[in-house]
Amino acid sequence: MTEQAKWNFDNSYARLPQPFFARLKPNPVRSPKLVLFNEPLATALGLNGEALQQPEGVAVLAGNVIPEGGEALAQAYAGHQFGHFTMLGDGRALLIGEQITPDGNRFDIQLKGSGRTPFSRGGDGRAALGPMLREFLISEAMHALGIPTTRSLAVVTTGEEIWRETELPGAVLTRVAESHLRVGTFQYAAGRGEVNDVKTLADYAIKRHYPELAESENPYLSLLEQVITRQANLISQWQLVGFVHGVMNTDNMTISGETIDYGPCAFMDTYDPATVFSSIDTQGRYAYGNQPQIANWNLARFAETLVPLLAEDETKGVEMAQSAIEGFKGQYVSNWLAGIRKKLGLFNAEDGDKDFVEKLLRLMHEHEADYTNTFRLLTLGQPEKTAMNGAAEFSEWLEQWQQRQSRQAQTKDEAMKLMRTNNPAVIPRNHRVEEALAAAVDEEDDSLVKQLIAVLKEPYAYSEEQERYAEVPERCQHGYVTYCGT
Protein backbone atom coordinates (compact mmCIF):
# COMPACT_ATOMS: atom_id res chain seq x y z
CA MET A 1 0.00 0.00 0.00
CA THR A 2 1.29 3.49 -0.88
CA GLU A 3 2.38 5.49 2.13
CA GLN A 4 -0.02 8.29 3.01
CA ALA A 5 0.67 11.64 1.37
CA LYS A 6 0.48 13.33 4.80
CA TRP A 7 -2.20 15.85 3.95
CA ASN A 8 -2.98 17.89 7.07
CA PHE A 9 -6.05 19.76 5.88
CA ASP A 10 -8.36 22.42 7.22
CA ASN A 11 -10.47 24.99 5.39
CA SER A 12 -10.83 28.14 7.46
CA TYR A 13 -12.18 30.02 4.44
CA ALA A 14 -15.22 27.73 4.47
CA ARG A 15 -16.10 29.17 7.88
CA LEU A 16 -16.64 32.64 6.42
CA PRO A 17 -20.21 33.70 5.54
CA GLN A 18 -21.75 31.77 2.64
CA PRO A 19 -21.72 34.68 0.14
CA PHE A 20 -17.91 34.46 -0.05
CA PHE A 21 -17.89 31.07 -1.77
CA ALA A 22 -19.86 28.25 -3.34
CA ARG A 23 -19.42 24.68 -2.10
CA LEU A 24 -18.94 22.24 -4.94
CA LYS A 25 -18.31 18.62 -5.67
CA PRO A 26 -15.22 18.04 -7.81
CA ASN A 27 -15.62 17.32 -11.51
CA PRO A 28 -13.56 14.14 -11.94
CA VAL A 29 -11.29 13.79 -14.96
CA ARG A 30 -10.97 10.71 -17.13
CA SER A 31 -7.33 9.68 -16.95
CA PRO A 32 -5.05 11.86 -14.81
CA LYS A 33 -1.32 11.65 -15.49
CA LEU A 34 1.41 13.50 -13.60
CA VAL A 35 3.54 15.72 -15.86
CA LEU A 36 5.40 18.01 -13.44
CA PHE A 37 5.91 17.66 -9.70
CA ASN A 38 7.66 20.03 -7.29
CA GLU A 39 9.37 17.76 -4.77
CA PRO A 40 11.07 20.54 -2.71
CA LEU A 41 7.75 22.38 -2.32
CA ALA A 42 5.99 19.17 -1.29
CA THR A 43 8.63 18.63 1.40
CA ALA A 44 8.30 22.22 2.64
CA LEU A 45 4.54 21.68 2.96
CA GLY A 46 5.09 18.55 5.04
CA LEU A 47 3.82 16.27 2.28
CA ASN A 48 5.16 12.89 1.20
CA GLY A 49 6.25 13.57 -2.36
CA GLU A 50 6.72 9.91 -3.22
CA ALA A 51 3.16 9.09 -2.20
CA LEU A 52 1.75 12.06 -4.11
CA GLN A 53 3.32 10.77 -7.31
CA GLN A 54 1.48 7.44 -7.02
CA PRO A 55 -2.00 7.00 -8.56
CA GLU A 56 -3.78 7.76 -5.26
CA GLY A 57 -1.83 11.00 -4.91
CA VAL A 58 -2.31 12.02 -8.53
CA ALA A 59 -6.07 11.54 -8.06
CA VAL A 60 -5.96 14.34 -5.46
CA LEU A 61 -3.88 16.59 -7.72
CA ALA A 62 -6.42 16.07 -10.50
CA GLY A 63 -9.42 16.85 -8.29
CA ASN A 64 -10.83 13.33 -8.41
CA VAL A 65 -10.40 12.89 -4.64
CA ILE A 66 -10.51 15.44 -1.82
CA PRO A 67 -8.32 14.58 1.20
CA GLU A 68 -9.86 14.22 4.64
CA GLY A 69 -10.38 17.64 6.22
CA GLY A 70 -10.67 19.34 2.85
CA GLU A 71 -13.76 20.98 1.43
CA ALA A 72 -13.95 21.98 -2.22
CA LEU A 73 -15.20 25.49 -2.86
CA ALA A 74 -15.01 28.25 -5.46
CA GLN A 75 -14.26 31.68 -4.05
CA ALA A 76 -16.35 34.71 -4.92
CA TYR A 77 -14.71 38.04 -5.66
CA ALA A 78 -15.14 41.12 -7.81
CA GLY A 79 -12.66 43.26 -9.66
CA HIS A 80 -11.81 46.18 -11.86
CA GLN A 81 -10.80 44.56 -15.14
CA PHE A 82 -8.97 47.15 -17.22
CA GLY A 83 -10.68 49.78 -15.07
CA HIS A 84 -14.22 48.39 -15.38
CA PHE A 85 -15.88 46.93 -12.28
CA THR A 86 -17.53 43.53 -12.49
CA MET A 87 -18.54 40.67 -10.21
CA LEU A 88 -16.32 37.64 -10.71
CA GLY A 89 -15.21 34.50 -8.85
CA ASP A 90 -13.25 31.31 -9.41
CA GLY A 91 -14.50 30.26 -12.83
CA ARG A 92 -12.15 27.32 -13.26
CA ALA A 93 -10.53 26.73 -9.89
CA LEU A 94 -11.36 25.03 -6.60
CA LEU A 95 -9.85 25.67 -3.20
CA ILE A 96 -9.78 22.13 -1.82
CA GLY A 97 -8.28 23.00 1.54
CA GLU A 98 -5.46 24.55 3.50
CA GLN A 99 -2.38 22.48 4.23
CA ILE A 100 -1.04 23.10 7.74
CA THR A 101 2.72 22.58 7.65
CA PRO A 102 4.80 20.97 10.44
CA ASP A 103 5.79 24.45 11.66
CA GLY A 104 2.16 25.55 11.85
CA ASN A 105 1.92 27.69 8.72
CA ARG A 106 -1.18 27.51 6.55
CA PHE A 107 -1.20 27.37 2.73
CA ASP A 108 -4.10 27.26 0.29
CA ILE A 109 -4.16 24.27 -2.04
CA GLN A 110 -6.07 25.27 -5.16
CA LEU A 111 -6.74 23.23 -8.30
CA LYS A 112 -6.77 25.35 -11.45
CA GLY A 113 -8.62 23.87 -14.41
CA SER A 114 -10.84 21.74 -12.20
CA GLY A 115 -14.14 22.33 -14.01
CA ARG A 116 -17.22 24.53 -14.07
CA THR A 117 -18.32 26.60 -11.08
CA PRO A 118 -21.20 29.04 -10.53
CA PHE A 119 -18.71 31.76 -11.55
CA SER A 120 -17.65 30.24 -14.89
CA ARG A 121 -19.70 32.73 -16.93
CA GLY A 122 -20.29 30.27 -19.75
CA GLY A 123 -16.79 28.80 -19.76
CA ASP A 124 -16.00 25.11 -19.44
CA GLY A 125 -13.92 25.59 -16.30
CA ARG A 126 -11.05 23.61 -17.74
CA ALA A 127 -7.47 24.58 -18.57
CA ALA A 128 -5.12 23.69 -21.41
CA LEU A 129 -1.77 22.05 -20.77
CA GLY A 130 0.34 24.89 -22.21
CA PRO A 131 -0.84 27.68 -19.87
CA MET A 132 -0.61 25.39 -16.84
CA LEU A 133 2.98 24.42 -17.67
CA ARG A 134 3.68 28.11 -18.23
CA GLU A 135 2.40 29.08 -14.79
CA PHE A 136 4.41 26.31 -13.15
CA LEU A 137 7.55 27.40 -14.96
CA ILE A 138 7.27 31.14 -14.40
CA SER A 139 5.94 31.07 -10.83
CA GLU A 140 8.82 28.82 -9.79
CA ALA A 141 11.27 31.09 -11.64
CA MET A 142 9.87 34.06 -9.70
CA HIS A 143 10.34 32.14 -6.46
CA ALA A 144 13.95 31.41 -7.37
CA LEU A 145 14.47 35.13 -8.05
CA GLY A 146 13.32 35.80 -4.49
CA ILE A 147 10.06 37.49 -5.49
CA PRO A 148 6.92 36.79 -3.40
CA THR A 149 4.66 34.54 -5.44
CA THR A 150 2.12 31.79 -5.44
CA ARG A 151 3.82 28.44 -6.05
CA SER A 152 3.15 25.44 -8.26
CA LEU A 153 3.08 21.95 -6.77
CA ALA A 154 2.10 19.89 -9.81
CA VAL A 155 0.67 19.76 -13.31
CA VAL A 156 -1.53 16.81 -14.22
CA THR A 157 -2.97 16.08 -17.65
CA THR A 158 -6.60 15.00 -17.58
CA GLY A 159 -6.79 12.59 -20.51
CA GLU A 160 -9.45 14.88 -21.99
CA GLU A 161 -9.32 17.38 -24.83
CA ILE A 162 -10.60 20.93 -24.48
CA TRP A 163 -11.50 23.42 -27.19
CA ARG A 164 -9.57 26.72 -27.46
CA GLU A 165 -9.98 27.57 -31.17
CA THR A 166 -8.50 24.10 -31.65
CA GLU A 167 -8.37 20.91 -29.61
CA LEU A 168 -5.77 20.98 -26.84
CA PRO A 169 -4.82 18.57 -24.05
CA GLY A 170 -6.51 19.44 -20.76
CA ALA A 171 -4.57 19.87 -17.53
CA VAL A 172 -4.92 20.81 -13.87
CA LEU A 173 -2.37 22.92 -11.97
CA THR A 174 -2.03 22.62 -8.20
CA ARG A 175 -1.40 26.15 -6.98
CA VAL A 176 -0.09 26.88 -3.48
CA ALA A 177 -0.56 30.28 -1.86
CA GLU A 178 -0.44 31.93 1.54
CA SER A 179 -4.06 32.64 0.65
CA HIS A 180 -6.18 33.66 -2.31
CA LEU A 181 -7.57 36.76 -0.61
CA ARG A 182 -7.59 39.56 -3.16
CA VAL A 183 -8.40 43.25 -3.30
CA GLY A 184 -11.31 41.96 -5.38
CA THR A 185 -12.51 39.82 -2.47
CA PHE A 186 -12.96 42.99 -0.42
CA GLN A 187 -14.61 44.73 -3.38
CA TYR A 188 -17.07 41.85 -3.59
CA ALA A 189 -17.99 42.22 0.09
CA ALA A 190 -18.28 46.01 -0.15
CA GLY A 191 -20.23 45.78 -3.41
CA ARG A 192 -22.92 43.76 -1.67
CA GLY A 193 -23.41 46.66 0.75
CA GLU A 194 -22.76 44.54 3.84
CA VAL A 195 -20.30 46.37 6.11
CA ASN A 196 -20.36 43.44 8.53
CA ASP A 197 -19.12 41.17 5.75
CA VAL A 198 -16.24 43.55 5.04
CA LYS A 199 -15.39 43.56 8.75
CA THR A 200 -15.54 39.76 8.91
CA LEU A 201 -13.24 39.52 5.89
CA ALA A 202 -10.81 42.09 7.31
CA ASP A 203 -10.69 40.25 10.63
CA TYR A 204 -9.99 37.02 8.75
CA ALA A 205 -7.20 38.66 6.71
CA ILE A 206 -5.59 40.02 9.87
CA LYS A 207 -5.77 36.66 11.63
CA ARG A 208 -4.45 34.84 8.56
CA HIS A 209 -1.67 37.19 7.44
CA TYR A 210 -1.05 39.92 10.01
CA PRO A 211 -1.93 38.54 13.47
CA GLU A 212 0.32 41.11 15.13
CA LEU A 213 -2.11 43.85 14.02
CA ALA A 214 -5.02 42.55 16.11
CA GLU A 215 -3.88 44.56 19.12
CA SER A 216 -3.06 47.77 17.25
CA GLU A 217 -5.00 50.96 17.95
CA ASN A 218 -6.76 50.80 14.58
CA PRO A 219 -6.27 47.29 13.15
CA TYR A 220 -8.06 48.06 9.89
CA LEU A 221 -5.87 51.07 9.16
CA SER A 222 -2.86 48.94 10.05
CA LEU A 223 -4.09 46.26 7.64
CA LEU A 224 -4.32 48.81 4.84
CA GLU A 225 -0.83 50.12 5.63
CA GLN A 226 0.68 46.63 5.71
CA VAL A 227 -0.86 45.63 2.38
CA ILE A 228 0.46 48.87 0.87
CA THR A 229 3.94 48.09 2.23
CA ARG A 230 3.94 44.56 0.85
CA GLN A 231 2.70 45.66 -2.56
CA ALA A 232 5.25 48.47 -2.75
CA ASN A 233 7.92 45.86 -2.13
CA LEU A 234 6.43 43.40 -4.64
CA ILE A 235 6.04 45.86 -7.51
CA SER A 236 9.56 47.20 -7.01
CA GLN A 237 10.87 43.64 -7.34
CA TRP A 238 8.90 43.14 -10.55
CA GLN A 239 10.42 46.29 -12.02
CA LEU A 240 13.94 45.31 -11.01
CA VAL A 241 13.83 42.09 -13.05
CA GLY A 242 11.78 43.42 -15.98
CA PHE A 243 8.66 41.40 -15.20
CA VAL A 244 5.45 42.48 -16.96
CA HIS A 245 2.38 41.01 -15.26
CA GLY A 246 -0.01 41.84 -18.06
CA VAL A 247 -3.34 41.71 -16.23
CA MET A 248 -3.11 43.86 -13.09
CA ASN A 249 -6.83 43.85 -12.41
CA THR A 250 -7.81 44.33 -8.77
CA ASP A 251 -8.78 40.67 -8.53
CA ASN A 252 -5.14 39.85 -9.28
CA MET A 253 -3.72 41.84 -6.36
CA THR A 254 -3.32 39.71 -3.24
CA ILE A 255 -3.67 40.78 0.37
CA SER A 256 -0.64 38.62 1.21
CA GLY A 257 1.61 40.50 -1.21
CA GLU A 258 2.21 37.50 -3.48
CA THR A 259 2.32 37.62 -7.28
CA ILE A 260 -0.72 35.78 -8.62
CA ASP A 261 -2.10 34.85 -12.06
CA TYR A 262 0.58 34.19 -14.65
CA GLY A 263 -1.71 34.18 -17.69
CA PRO A 264 -0.35 36.83 -20.07
CA CYS A 265 2.84 37.73 -18.18
CA ALA A 266 6.32 37.85 -19.74
CA PHE A 267 9.79 39.20 -19.08
CA MET A 268 11.03 42.23 -20.99
CA ASP A 269 13.95 41.74 -23.37
CA THR A 270 14.75 45.16 -24.87
CA TYR A 271 14.34 47.88 -22.25
CA ASP A 272 11.25 49.94 -23.01
CA PRO A 273 8.85 51.33 -20.38
CA ALA A 274 5.99 50.97 -22.89
CA THR A 275 6.47 47.19 -23.15
CA VAL A 276 3.16 45.31 -23.37
CA PHE A 277 2.73 41.62 -24.19
CA SER A 278 -0.93 40.83 -23.45
CA SER A 279 -3.19 40.44 -26.47
CA ILE A 280 -6.06 42.15 -24.66
CA ASP A 281 -4.10 45.15 -23.32
CA THR A 282 -4.55 47.14 -26.51
CA GLN A 283 -4.25 50.52 -24.76
CA GLY A 284 -1.12 49.65 -22.77
CA ARG A 285 -2.82 50.16 -19.42
CA TYR A 286 -0.63 47.50 -17.81
CA ALA A 287 2.63 48.33 -19.61
CA TYR A 288 5.88 47.74 -17.73
CA GLY A 289 6.33 51.43 -16.91
CA ASN A 290 2.73 51.80 -15.71
CA GLN A 291 2.82 48.98 -13.15
CA PRO A 292 3.64 51.14 -10.08
CA GLN A 293 0.83 53.60 -10.86
CA ILE A 294 -1.64 50.78 -11.49
CA ALA A 295 -0.70 49.16 -8.18
CA ASN A 296 -1.34 52.50 -6.47
CA TRP A 297 -4.74 52.75 -8.18
CA ASN A 298 -5.65 49.19 -7.16
CA LEU A 299 -4.69 49.88 -3.56
CA ALA A 300 -6.93 52.94 -3.58
CA ARG A 301 -9.82 50.63 -4.50
CA PHE A 302 -8.87 48.41 -1.54
CA ALA A 303 -8.80 51.45 0.74
CA GLU A 304 -12.31 52.43 -0.38
CA THR A 305 -13.69 49.13 0.89
CA LEU A 306 -12.18 49.72 4.33
CA VAL A 307 -13.37 53.32 4.83
CA PRO A 308 -16.42 52.33 6.96
CA LEU A 309 -14.09 50.41 9.29
CA LEU A 310 -11.45 53.12 9.67
CA ALA A 311 -13.57 55.66 11.55
CA GLU A 312 -17.18 56.24 12.55
CA ASP A 313 -17.13 59.53 10.66
CA GLU A 314 -16.95 58.85 6.91
CA THR A 315 -15.00 62.02 6.14
CA LYS A 316 -12.40 61.07 8.71
CA GLY A 317 -12.25 57.54 7.29
CA VAL A 318 -11.67 58.87 3.78
CA GLU A 319 -8.87 61.14 5.02
CA MET A 320 -7.18 58.24 6.79
CA ALA A 321 -7.42 56.06 3.67
CA GLN A 322 -6.06 58.81 1.42
CA SER A 323 -3.16 59.46 3.75
CA ALA A 324 -2.23 55.78 3.76
CA ILE A 325 -2.45 55.50 -0.04
CA GLU A 326 -0.23 58.54 -0.47
CA GLY A 327 2.51 56.57 1.25
CA PHE A 328 2.74 54.00 -1.55
CA LYS A 329 4.79 56.07 -3.99
CA GLY A 330 7.50 56.93 -1.48
CA GLN A 331 7.80 53.33 -0.33
CA TYR A 332 7.92 52.04 -3.90
CA VAL A 333 10.59 54.52 -5.02
CA SER A 334 12.67 53.83 -1.92
CA ASN A 335 12.48 50.06 -2.51
CA TRP A 336 13.22 50.38 -6.21
CA LEU A 337 16.20 52.69 -5.68
CA ALA A 338 17.60 50.40 -2.99
CA GLY A 339 17.29 47.48 -5.40
CA ILE A 340 18.82 49.28 -8.38
CA ARG A 341 21.77 50.36 -6.23
CA LYS A 342 22.44 46.71 -5.46
CA LYS A 343 22.26 45.90 -9.16
CA LEU A 344 25.03 48.47 -9.66
CA GLY A 345 27.14 47.34 -6.71
CA LEU A 346 26.37 50.41 -4.61
CA PHE A 347 26.15 49.98 -0.84
CA ASN A 348 25.15 53.49 0.19
CA ALA A 349 22.75 56.17 -0.98
CA GLU A 350 23.72 59.51 -2.51
CA ASP A 351 21.51 62.43 -3.47
CA GLY A 352 22.02 62.11 -7.22
CA ASP A 353 21.29 58.39 -7.42
CA LYS A 354 17.88 58.67 -9.07
CA ASP A 355 19.19 60.87 -11.91
CA PHE A 356 22.26 58.63 -12.24
CA VAL A 357 20.12 55.50 -12.67
CA GLU A 358 17.61 57.18 -14.96
CA LYS A 359 20.45 58.23 -17.26
CA LEU A 360 21.47 54.58 -17.66
CA LEU A 361 17.87 53.53 -18.33
CA ARG A 362 17.46 56.31 -20.90
CA LEU A 363 20.59 55.13 -22.72
CA MET A 364 19.35 51.55 -22.62
CA HIS A 365 16.07 52.66 -24.15
CA GLU A 366 17.71 54.77 -26.86
CA HIS A 367 20.10 51.97 -27.86
CA GLU A 368 17.49 49.19 -27.55
CA ALA A 369 19.63 47.39 -25.00
CA ASP A 370 18.55 44.12 -23.45
CA TYR A 371 17.49 44.87 -19.86
CA THR A 372 18.70 41.70 -18.13
CA ASN A 373 21.89 41.29 -20.15
CA THR A 374 22.97 44.90 -19.68
CA PHE A 375 23.13 44.39 -15.92
CA ARG A 376 24.59 40.91 -16.44
CA LEU A 377 27.42 42.29 -18.59
CA LEU A 378 28.12 45.08 -16.11
CA THR A 379 28.30 42.40 -13.41
CA LEU A 380 30.80 40.42 -15.51
CA GLY A 381 32.90 43.55 -16.07
CA GLN A 382 32.13 43.55 -19.79
CA PRO A 383 30.45 46.91 -20.52
CA GLU A 384 32.03 46.88 -23.99
CA LYS A 385 29.61 44.07 -24.93
CA THR A 386 26.50 46.13 -24.16
CA ALA A 387 24.41 47.77 -26.87
CA MET A 388 25.53 51.22 -25.66
CA ASN A 389 29.24 50.58 -26.22
CA GLY A 390 30.87 53.39 -28.18
CA ALA A 391 28.27 56.00 -27.22
CA ALA A 392 29.92 59.03 -25.64
CA GLU A 393 27.19 59.40 -23.02
CA PHE A 394 27.63 55.78 -21.96
CA SER A 395 31.38 56.29 -21.57
CA GLU A 396 30.60 59.28 -19.36
CA TRP A 397 28.14 57.22 -17.36
CA LEU A 398 30.70 54.41 -16.88
CA GLU A 399 33.19 56.94 -15.55
CA GLN A 400 30.58 58.31 -13.15
CA TRP A 401 29.79 54.75 -12.04
CA GLN A 402 33.44 54.00 -11.32
CA GLN A 403 33.74 57.23 -9.35
CA ARG A 404 30.53 56.41 -7.49
CA GLN A 405 31.90 53.00 -6.47
CA SER A 406 35.25 54.47 -5.46
CA ARG A 407 33.54 56.70 -2.88
CA GLN A 408 32.28 53.73 -0.86
CA ALA A 409 34.20 51.80 1.77
CA GLN A 410 33.58 48.41 0.17
CA THR A 411 36.06 46.89 -2.28
CA LYS A 412 35.45 46.30 -5.97
CA ASP A 413 35.20 42.56 -5.29
CA GLU A 414 32.52 43.20 -2.68
CA ALA A 415 30.64 45.38 -5.17
CA MET A 416 30.80 42.65 -7.81
CA LYS A 417 29.56 40.07 -5.31
CA LEU A 418 26.60 42.33 -4.49
CA MET A 419 25.83 42.65 -8.21
CA ARG A 420 26.02 38.89 -8.76
CA THR A 421 23.38 38.28 -6.10
CA ASN A 422 21.02 40.91 -7.54
CA ASN A 423 21.41 40.60 -11.31
CA PRO A 424 20.06 37.30 -12.65
CA ALA A 425 22.11 35.65 -15.36
CA VAL A 426 18.95 33.98 -16.66
CA ILE A 427 15.26 34.81 -16.71
CA PRO A 428 12.38 32.96 -18.44
CA ARG A 429 13.24 34.28 -21.91
CA ASN A 430 10.06 34.39 -23.94
CA HIS A 431 11.47 32.48 -26.91
CA ARG A 432 12.84 29.73 -24.65
CA VAL A 433 9.52 29.43 -22.83
CA GLU A 434 7.61 29.15 -26.11
CA GLU A 435 10.11 26.62 -27.47
CA ALA A 436 9.70 24.41 -24.40
CA LEU A 437 5.90 24.68 -24.31
CA ALA A 438 5.57 23.87 -28.01
CA ALA A 439 7.61 20.69 -27.54
CA ALA A 440 5.50 19.66 -24.55
CA VAL A 441 2.12 20.34 -26.13
CA ASP A 442 2.71 19.54 -29.80
CA GLU A 443 5.23 16.71 -29.48
CA GLU A 444 4.42 15.41 -25.98
CA ASP A 445 8.07 15.99 -25.07
CA ASP A 446 8.42 17.68 -21.68
CA SER A 447 12.22 17.46 -21.55
CA LEU A 448 12.76 21.09 -22.59
CA VAL A 449 10.31 22.31 -19.94
CA LYS A 450 12.14 20.32 -17.28
CA GLN A 451 15.54 21.57 -18.49
CA LEU A 452 14.31 25.17 -18.39
CA ILE A 453 12.86 24.75 -14.90
CA ALA A 454 16.20 23.34 -13.71
CA VAL A 455 18.17 26.26 -15.18
CA LEU A 456 15.80 28.86 -13.74
CA LYS A 457 16.13 27.41 -10.23
CA GLU A 458 19.62 28.99 -10.05
CA PRO A 459 19.21 32.42 -11.67
CA TYR A 460 22.30 33.89 -9.99
CA ALA A 461 24.67 30.98 -10.65
CA TYR A 462 26.46 32.52 -13.67
CA SER A 463 27.35 29.02 -14.91
CA GLU A 464 28.43 27.96 -18.40
CA GLU A 465 25.31 25.81 -18.66
CA GLN A 466 23.21 28.98 -18.51
CA GLU A 467 24.80 30.67 -21.52
CA ARG A 468 22.24 29.30 -23.99
CA TYR A 469 19.40 30.55 -21.83
CA ALA A 470 20.90 34.03 -21.47
CA GLU A 471 20.92 34.61 -25.23
CA VAL A 472 18.48 37.20 -26.54
CA PRO A 473 16.08 36.17 -29.31
CA GLU A 474 17.26 36.67 -32.89
CA ARG A 475 14.21 38.79 -33.54
CA CYS A 476 13.37 41.56 -31.11
CA GLN A 477 10.44 41.18 -28.71
CA HIS A 478 8.20 43.59 -30.63
CA GLY A 479 5.24 41.57 -31.80
CA TYR A 480 5.57 38.92 -29.09
CA VAL A 481 2.03 38.44 -27.78
CA THR A 482 0.79 36.56 -24.73
CA TYR A 483 -2.67 35.19 -23.99
CA CYS A 484 -4.42 34.55 -20.70
CA GLY A 485 -5.17 30.92 -21.60
CA THR A 486 -8.81 31.02 -20.47
Curated annotation (Swiss-Prot):
Q: Name one Pfam family in it.
A: SelO
Q: Which cofactor does it need?
A: Mg(2+); Mn(2+)
SS bond partners: none
Catalyses which reaction(s): L-seryl-[protein] + ATP = 3-O-(5'-adenylyl)-L-seryl-[protein] + diphosphate; L-threonyl-[protein] + ATP = 3-O-(5'-adenylyl)-L-threonyl-[protein] + diphosphate; L-tyrosyl-[protein] + ATP = O-(5'-adenylyl)-L-tyrosyl-[protein] + diphosphate; L-histidyl-[protein] + UTP = N(tele)-(5'-uridylyl)-L-histidyl-[protein] + diphosphate
Q: Give the EC number(s) under which this enzyme is classified.
A: 2.7.7.-, 2.7.7.108
Alphabetized InterPro entries for the sequence: SelO (IPR003846)
Q: Which domain of life is it from?
A: Bacteria
- UniProt KW keywords: ATP-binding, Magnesium, Manganese, Metal-binding, Nucleotide-binding, Nucleotidyltransferase, Transferase
Q: Where does Mg(2+) bind?
A: N252, D261
Spell out the catalytic residues: D251
Write down the top EC class of this protein.
Answer: transferase
Task: Give me the residues that bind ATP, please.
Answer: G89, G91, R92, K112, D124, G125, R175, R182, D261
> What molecular function terms (GO) are annotated for this protein?
AMPylase activity; ATP binding; magnesium ion binding
According to its UniProt entry, the function of this protein is described as: Nucleotidyltransferase involved in the post-translational modification of proteins. It can catalyze the addition of adenosine monophosphate (AMP) or uridine monophosphate (UMP) to a protein, resulting in modifications known as AMPylation and UMPylation.
User: Per the similarity annotation, which family is this?
Assistant: Belongs to the SELO family.
Return the protein name.
Answer: Protein nucleotidyltransferase YdiU
Q: What organism is the protein native to?
A: Shouchella clausii (strain KSM-K16)
Q: What is the lineage of its organism?
A: Bacteria, Bacillati, Bacillota, Bacilli, Bacillales
**Gene this protein is translated from:** ydiU
